[in-house]
Amino acid sequence: EPEFVEINWDTKETELAAKSIDCIWNGLTLTDDREENMACTKPYVKNAQVVVVKDGTEYTSTADLVGKTVVAEAGSAGETTIQEDENLAQADYVSKSVQTDCLMEVAAGTADAAVLDLTLASAMIGEGTDYANLKMVDELNVEEYGVAFRKGSDVAAAVDTAFDELKADGTMGALAEKYGLTLAE
């Protein structure tokens, strides 16, 4: 029986190495570094980092955010995107403990923009949500999610086999459609 545990996303690799958790499954962006240091599955879903602002905000590119307050979750792909984007790196970056805090900051006007996962933003902003006054204005880095286990684990291969079976029988496609996701190739 699995036990699902919320952790500090900024220390996810440390938690895994210390055996506090057995895998990282929730929205883990696959990177070369992670694939070198952990046993990772094949990608299962596509994602991107997006810029979220208040409705009515004039935005044409990340250059509009130079000198503005931009938030992202500490240790996330959003944080990496801010650090690596020529314009966003010149923003006043403030890290938050979770992505939903980033949305609260933008909605409250204490941050000008947030950089976070497309999958989360799609589900949490716009008409009919608690953040109806927010909108996505830019899609930045396209990425893929996978599942990570401790280096040397054979569980990643078993999960890959399960993913292959779930793709073949249409289960993953049906779930992706239900939740507005795009499966990785």
Regions of interest found by a model, annotated:
Residues 77-97, 132-136, 164-185:
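Ligand-binding clefts/hinges and TM-proximal coupling segments of bilobed small-molecule sensing domains
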Residues 16-17, 65, 106-107, 147, ...:
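Hydrophobic residues within well-ordered alpha-helices
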Residues 45-53, 118, 122, 126-164, ...:
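Periplasmic-binding protein-like
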Residues 3-64:
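Acidic, polar ligand-binding/catalytic clefts
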Residues 28-29, 46-101, 113, 118-122:
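Bilobed "Venus flytrap"/periplasmic-binding protein-like clamshell domains
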Residues 22-23, 112-113, 146:
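Short, Asp-centered acidic motifs that coordinate Mg2+ and/or phosphate
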Residues 27-36, 81-84, 107-108, 112-141:
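A ligand-binding cleft/hinge motif common to bilobed small-molecule-binding domains
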Residues 3-15, 57, 94-108, 142-143:
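Short helix-initiation/N-cap motifs at beta->coil->alpha
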